[in-house]
């Protein structure tokens, strides 16, 4: 594999320290200055102990950070020992294999094999992942010393189906030496397949017992100890996530609280009525004679297809079946031929001695095609939903999952009884000693000093330093406050009367002037009550034309008042403003405008000012020298990909790239594209990056007066969101060359740093002393950073909790440095990242990830606003299989409209984040 980076033998970094054998990423000697660079607090960062021969996927850790005040925290992990013996790895093939068997059935087959078929061979017991991998702590004694063996046996379970013959073939594929993992955590072993397999084996060991006992997914299991019914046929079960994670010189099991969405147990009638939002006694709503609408049947079918039901027929054992689809007619109306005579489903069951109580109710069709009345089916509890939770239930899921830090920590510690590592025969067999007696591990953290922020002329305090991740706009003016020359108000909420509109106008004008914006006393035109018969775009056209007739120009801004359920209207408004006309729009919910406070309108101004070209605040240069060095002009990118929801086929993924155009890293622009569904690599990254870079250089020349030679960036910092650890290599091999190509095509000679920012992980931190926590939430304070103990043994990474946290337990962002030509120290990169978390324009609180990454997330989520709502393209265009997908993708790309040229240079995305297209 080709080595990436500058590939020099000897070079000099910008600070003048000599580098030996420097390469931009793993695959060669580490980028360690011979004389350690100074950290932000003037100290030399603590050195690391990594053997020179060790290779990595990303950048080797250059040093440990030292900046900030020390803080001791608990991490939600338990320390574990490693096995002393060789682990034997076997491939598993189960026949018959005409279809993929459920993992749960596979687990039961292997359990039956070990305990009933070949007990002597599996002593001590082996562990199995439910698919292809089985691990044993001693070599399985196959006859004749063979490497492979077939076990044939008959297996019957409690589903009511006849016993079947199965053949399990086990083939030895490797021996896993845990010593490789021990060498890895002390920095003497590369992160290779041997290490990955060892980690995989240990994860299978700790998950084996819960997988056999409880409902589970890949990494979590769920217990019925804490259940909440939220409607829609859904129950939420509290559970536990667990994952073996190598740390620095120690190995841990990361344990967290998780939430599983289950189908409600009980009768199928009860489940169906709950899904449809009907009362429990409204059984006849499911009657075809009463005329249950077909759309409701289809809605119910979408939700419960795939559910396992147990059929209770007198005189026969209960039988487990899977719902395939629903009928639109009742059992009394569904006819079929039996003994050359046409009878109904209801008559057939009556011939078996079963008189249906509800013969007119619709029926289910199960996997083998049989039709079964609803009343004969019950739903066993503990069935995980594989579909996305409906949007109207999301708030209840969040409420159930949200726990204050001390409560979450107690729940994890209380979960030791359920995890029961000491009682697991599998954990004991493999010699793991999980130290749960000592409780959660203690970790050394630091709290970084926040950056200073600079506001505009006329501010009583132009430079401020946030405290606890927050500040306010009292007596402050925007750094660059814009002028609203003309504006229009359009009201789409009938109950929002003229007096309410006048309150809105007064409150908004006052708030604008408080922060230094210039605005006329009155809007040029207002629509007190929109015409319910006319289209939204037509009414916005009329409002714009009225403004032009009255003032001779288009409005600078249109404020739109929406009803509470106005999400579809929002999409049409944004298409009109951002795509068709290039006029900024600000949508406000009528409910929030009613008797709104001055604080509410101040928050609206934060969004509006940047939408029309302003800058709210900038980082004060001396407090973030790593970001604002004038000798190294910088463009900071944020990039993201959003994929279609589970269960949707033929839908594309949407990509976004955001970058700053100004020298202060406060003014951002964005571009979005369409690509093949579920593809993580951004295939158009070169063109998207060029779009940002061209406009950045143009802005710096025209607006900042920079000479052409000084307008081009000398540093590029690329933050990438949404990439799993298994995709790091692909990002390096595919996206990094595209970013370099963009620079080369534009003649830009910039040093690149590429960083993955991850939020989908389960690492949490809790202050050891509650007095050190955030005063309101009890979380670790904003700026808490950890790059030791539970961090990666060899690669440059850190956890940064940059926000104060309001509800629940804050989740830190995990930063992994994949490529670094800028030779950042741990302190400088941590400080830079923390500073960027304070530049999210629509907030006076630091956010959980750097602002450009947050913006990229929003741009992806708003991708549906690039489609003409009149075509209903997002809901009508759906390919049914992979052969249709290319045509569907072409259609999605063709109908994806580019931003209006005026909006392409503005922060049009500084607004509410709506759900992505699904």
Model-derived features: positions:
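Long, low-complexity, intrinsically disordered terminal regions
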Residues: 2-918
């Amino acid at each position: 594999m080709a080595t990436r980076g500058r590939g020099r033998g000897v070079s000099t970094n910008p600070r003048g320290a000599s580098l030996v054998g420097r390469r931009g990423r793993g695959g060669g000697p580490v980028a360690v200055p011979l004389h350690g660079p100074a950290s932000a607090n003037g100290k030399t960062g603590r050195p690391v102990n990594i053997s020179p021969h060790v290779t990595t996927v990303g950048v080797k850790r250059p040093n440990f950070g030292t900046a900030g005040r020390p803080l001791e925290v608990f991490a939600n992990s338990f320390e574990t020992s490693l096995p002393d013996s060789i682990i034997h790895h076997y491939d598993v093939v189960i026949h018959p294999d005409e279809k993929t068997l459920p993992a749960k059935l596979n687990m039961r087959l292997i359990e039956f094999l070990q305990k009933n078929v070949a007990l002597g061979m599996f002593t001590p017991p082996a562990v199995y992942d439910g698919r292809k991998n089985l691990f044993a702590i001693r070599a399985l004694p196959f006859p004749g010393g063979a490497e492979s063996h077939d076990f044939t046996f008959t297996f019957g379970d409690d589903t009511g189906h006849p016993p079947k013959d199965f053949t399990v073939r086990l083939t030895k594929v490797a021996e896993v030496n845990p010593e490789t993992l021990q060498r890895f955590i002390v920095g003497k072993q590369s992160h290779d397949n041997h290490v990955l397999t060892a980690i995989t084996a240990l994860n299978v060991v700790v998950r084996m017992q819960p997988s056999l006992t409880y409902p589970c997914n890949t990494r979590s299991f769920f217990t019925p100890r804490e259940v909440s019914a939220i409607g829609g046929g859904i129950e939420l079960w509290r559970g536990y996530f667990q994952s073996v994670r190598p740390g620095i010189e120690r190995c841990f099991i990361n344990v967290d609280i998780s939430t599983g969405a289950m189908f409600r147990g009980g009768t199928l009638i009860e489940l169906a009525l709950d899904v449809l939002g009907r009362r429990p006694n409204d059984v006849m709503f499911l009657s075809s004679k009463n005329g249950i609408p077909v759309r409701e049947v289809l809605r119910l079918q979408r939700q419960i297809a795939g559910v396992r039901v147990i059929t209770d027929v007198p005189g026969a054992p209960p039988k487990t079946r899977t719902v395939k689809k629903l009928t639109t007619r009742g059992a009394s109306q569904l006819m079929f031929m039996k003994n050359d005579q046409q009878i109904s489903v209801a008559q057939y069951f009556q011939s078996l001695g079963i008189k249906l109580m509800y013969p007119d109710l619709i029926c289910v069709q199960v996997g083998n095609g049989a039709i079964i009345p609803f009343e004969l089916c019950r739903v066993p509890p503990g069935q995980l939903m594989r579909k996305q939770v409906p949007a109207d239930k999301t708030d209840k899921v969040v409420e159930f999952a949200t726990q204050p830090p001390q409560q979450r920590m107690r729940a994890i510690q209380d979960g030791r009884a359920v995890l029961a590592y000491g009682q697991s025969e599998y954990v004991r067999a493999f010699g793991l000693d999980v130290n749960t007696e000592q409780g959660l591990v203690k970790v050394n953290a630091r709290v970084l000093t926040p950056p200073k922020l600079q506001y505009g002329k006329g501010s009583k305090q132009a430079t401020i330093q946030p405290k606890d991740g927050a500040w306010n706009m009292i007596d402050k003016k925007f750094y660059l406050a814009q002028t609203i020359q003309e504006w229009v108000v359009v009201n789409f909420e009938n109950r929002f009367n003229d007096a309410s509109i006048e309150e809105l106008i007064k409150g908004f004008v006052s708030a604008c002037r408080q922060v230094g914006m210039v605005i006329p006393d009155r809007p040029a035109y207002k629509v007190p009550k929109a015409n319910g018969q006319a289209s939204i775009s037509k009414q916005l056209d009329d409002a714009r034309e009225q403004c032009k007739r009255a003032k001779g120009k288009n409005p600078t801004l249109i404020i739109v008042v929406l009803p509470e359920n106005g999400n579809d209207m929002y999409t049409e408004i944004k298409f009109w403003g951002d795509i068709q006309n290039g006029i900024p729009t600000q949508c406000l919910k009528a409910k929030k405008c009613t008797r709104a406070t001055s604080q509410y309108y101040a928050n609206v101004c934060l969004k509006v000012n940047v939408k029309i070209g302003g800058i709210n605040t900038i980082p004060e240069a001396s407090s973030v020298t790593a970001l604002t060095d004038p000798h190294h002009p910088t463009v900071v990118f944020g990039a993201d990909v959003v994929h279609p929801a589970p269960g949707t086929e033929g839908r594309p993924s949407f990509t976004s790239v955001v970058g700053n155009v100004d020298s202060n890293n406060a003014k951002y622009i964005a571009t979005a594209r369409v690509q093949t569904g579920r593809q993580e690599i951004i295939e158009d990254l070169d063109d998207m990056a060029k779009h940002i870079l061209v406009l950045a250089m143009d802005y710096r020349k025209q607006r900042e007066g920079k000479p052409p030679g000084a307008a081009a960036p000398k540093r590029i910092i690329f933050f990438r969101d949404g990439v799993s650890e298994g995709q790091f290599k692909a990002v390096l091999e595919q996206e990094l060359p595209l970013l370099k190509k963009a620079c080369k095509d534009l003649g830009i000679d910039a040093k690149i740093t590429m960083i993955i920012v991850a939020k989908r992980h389960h690492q949490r931190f809790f202050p050891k002393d509650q007095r050190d926590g955030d005063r309101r939430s009890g979380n670790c304070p904003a700026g808490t950073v950890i790059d030791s103990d539970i961090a990666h043994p060899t690669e440059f990474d850190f956890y940064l909790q940059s926000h104060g946290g309001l509800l629940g337990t804050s989740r830190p962002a995990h930063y992994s440095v994949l490529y670094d030509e800028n030779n950042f120290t741990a302190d400088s990169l941590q400080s830079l990242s923390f500073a960027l978390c304070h530049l999210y324009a629509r907030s006076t609180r630091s956010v959980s990830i750097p602002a450009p990454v947050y913006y990229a997330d929003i741009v992806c989520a708003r991708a549906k606003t690039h489609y003409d709502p009149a075509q209903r393209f997002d809901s009508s265009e759906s390919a049914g299989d992979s052969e249709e997908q290319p045509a569907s993708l072409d259609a999605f790309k063709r109908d994806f409209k580019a931003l209006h040229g005026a909006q392409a240079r503005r922060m049009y995305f500084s607004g509410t984040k709506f759900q992505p297209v699904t």
